[in-house]
């Protein structure tokens, strides 16, 4: 019994911390990494005897030295770690559950190795004992604010507390190990009972993000918000051929290295967390459903009156006009609410809802980032006036990521790819790790995709100053009334611009959304410059061949 209690008394166990997985962009630029550091801890029982074995009777000189040890050790810790000696007295005199001096008391996390070497040097020079260290790496974000709303951050304990760091914390964290051994106040007992369970490092991820494009997107977004005197905004850039997200920018933003200084509105990933009425960009989805059903072609005719009765109210267009005779192409180019609603009335409500669902609206994209909103779409039993509203982008809500992924699936030949942020992963042993599979489904025909691209190209080719050099581009503007969550009424605007290129074989999509602009409010004025700038950089960056044909200009009106 005595031997057992002595063994328990001298048993010493501490955790071995794994290295957290690294995050890099698609080109290997480090977004989040772990740097070597140590956890400083003390053995209060060892300090109380200043290293003299408990089985040895101390001399008077040793007793005097031991009595001074807690104060001396606290002073060394304060000198090297900052603060006052009193701040460390609790740690160096800590007791266990039985009220006895503890064998293990944490002093400070994330201390750099150089500082701990200075502590060891001071302890040795003074002839003091009882301060130790174990692996306790520091999480750093070399890119700072770049993609911080996506990458996220860790808390003081090193656990993911925001963004990808939070949603993939378990995989990134790895599995702690532990080491147990028998020790006296002099240290390990050489032939004692020793066990070692090694830590397993966390999984490292290569993201689909392009850090340089992400930086440009954040800069372009910041400029757009400043010029529009807006509250906030977001940009998402995608490769339409596979659903990979190349940039995901939110403003205002923060520095992942300093999450404690960030406000809640700065840490939001607006691209996935903010749901809003998309406005006229939604007309692309409406036209896609109509063309896929064979109800219209780009040349279909529609008589557009100056106003349209709907549910006891009237639908009007942004610019007042008399009776117009537009093609479907002209309806999209002029962004006619009336023309879109009239066409949509030829579409069965249940069919409309099935297309909205196929396009990925009304449900999270499951991109693997926290706080993703679902948005809302109406039921097939919606009243007629709701169908009118939904056709031109009111009466439903989406996230920027949902809307971007939907348009990507329309223009790429008609195949929806669930958006993804993960390119590849490697586990703690250096072996490839399985990543979530993206879902793909055909949503419209190849023919319908070509017809929608025809209409979107004319939005650009018939406007002044909007094309990008060397590439044919398709686009759609959006200007939606903003629903104020406080009064549940319309207040202010959400202005947007979505662009895809090259239109003959789309590769890159850019969607810019500006919230509550006060200096201009149309998507063309507020959001288009940022989209144009980013597209002109991204296309050559990804080796996309310039267009060989000139942009087409097709009839927007017809003679009755």
Language model feature labels by segment:
Residues 1, 27-116, 198-202, 346, ...:
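Peptidoglycan glycan-strand catalytic modules in the bacterial/periplasmic cell-wall system
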Residues 1-13, 197:
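Aromatic-capped interface at the extracytoplasmic side
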Residues 9-36:
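Short extracytoplasmic
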Residues 10, 15-18, 229-233, 419:
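Short, small/polar residue-rich loop motifs at catalytic or cofactor-binding pockets
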Residues 32, 183-194, 239-280, 285-516, ...:
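Beta-lactam-recognizing serine transpeptidase/beta-lactamase-like catalytic domain environment
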Residues 71, 75, 79, 109, ...:
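Solvent-exposed, polar/charged alpha-helical surfaces in well-ordered, non-transmembrane soluble domains
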Residues 72-80, 88-201, 512, 529:
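Small/polar-residue-rich segments within soluble enzyme cores
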Residues 189-233:
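Conserved, well-ordered alpha-helix/loop/beta-strand core segments that scaffold catalytic motifs
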């Amino acid at each position: 019994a005595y031997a057992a209690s002595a063994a328990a008394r001298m048993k010493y166990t501490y955790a071995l911390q794994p290295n957290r997985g690294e995050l890099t962009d698609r080109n290997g630029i480090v977004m989040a990494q772990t740097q070597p550091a140590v956890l400083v801890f003390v053995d209060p029982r060892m300090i109380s005897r200043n290293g003299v074995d408990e089985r040895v009777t101390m001399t008077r000189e040793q007793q005097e030295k031991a009595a001074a040890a807690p104060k001396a050790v606290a002073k060394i810790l304060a000198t090297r770690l900052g603060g006052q000696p009193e701040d460390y007295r609790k740690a160096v005199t800590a007791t266990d559950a039985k009220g006895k001096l503890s064998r293990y008391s944490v002093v400070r996390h994330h201390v750099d190795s150089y500082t701990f070497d200075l502590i060891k040097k001071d302890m040795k020079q003074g002839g003091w004992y009882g301060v130790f260290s174990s692996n306790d790496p520091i999480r750093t974000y070399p890119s700072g604010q770049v993609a911080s709303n996506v990458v996220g951050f860790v808390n003081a304990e090193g656990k993911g507390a925001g963004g990808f760091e939070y949603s993939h914390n378990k995989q990134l964290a790895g599995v702690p190990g532990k080491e147990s051994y028998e020790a006296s106040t002099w240290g390990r007992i050489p032939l004692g009972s020793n066990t070692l369970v090694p830590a397993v490092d966390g999984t490292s991820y290569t993201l689909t993000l392009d850090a340089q494009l992400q930086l440009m997107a954040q800069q372009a977004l910041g400029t757009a918000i400043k010029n529009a005197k807006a509250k906030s905004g977001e940009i998402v850039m995608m490769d339409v051929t596979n659903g990979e997200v190349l940039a995901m920018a939110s403003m205002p933003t923060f520095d992942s290295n300093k999450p404690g200084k960030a406000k809640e509105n700065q840490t939001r990933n607006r691209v996935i967390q903010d749901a809003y009425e998309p406005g006229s960009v939604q007309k692309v989805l409406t036209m896609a459903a109509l063309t896929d059903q064979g109800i219209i072609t780009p040349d279909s005719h529609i008589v557009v009156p100056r106003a349209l009765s709907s549910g006891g109210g009237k639908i009007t267009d942004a610019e007042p006009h008399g009776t117009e005779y537009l093609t479907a192409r002209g309806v999209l180019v002029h962004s006619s609410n009336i023309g879109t609603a009239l066409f949509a009335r030829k579409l069965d409500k249940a069919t409309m809802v099935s297309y909205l669902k196929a396009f990925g609206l009304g449900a999270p994209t499951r991109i693997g980032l926290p706080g993703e909103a679902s948005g809302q779409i109406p039921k097939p039993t919606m009243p007629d006036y709701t169908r009118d509203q939904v056709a031109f982008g009111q009466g439903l809500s989406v996230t920027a990521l949902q809307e971007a992924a939907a348009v990507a699936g329309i223009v790429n030949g008609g195949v929806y790819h669930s958006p993804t942020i993960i390119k590849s992963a490697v586990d703690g042993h250096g072996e490839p790790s399985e990543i979530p599979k993206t879902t793909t489904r055909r949503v419209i025909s190849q023919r319908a995709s070509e017809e929608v691209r025809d209409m979107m190209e004319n939005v650009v080719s018939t406007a002044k100053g909007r094309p990008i050099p060397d590439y044919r581009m398709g686009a759609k503007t959006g200007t939606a009334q903003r629903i104020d969550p406080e009064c549940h009424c319309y207040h202010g605007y959400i202005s947007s611009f979505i662009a895809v290129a090259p239109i003959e074989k789309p590769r890159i999509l850019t969607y810019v959304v500006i919230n509550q602009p006060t200096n201009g409010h149309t998507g063309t004025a507020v959001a288009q410059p940022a989209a144009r700038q980013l597209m002109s950089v991204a296309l050559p960056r990804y080796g996309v061949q310039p267009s060989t044909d000139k942009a087409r200009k097709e009839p927007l009106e017809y003679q009755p």
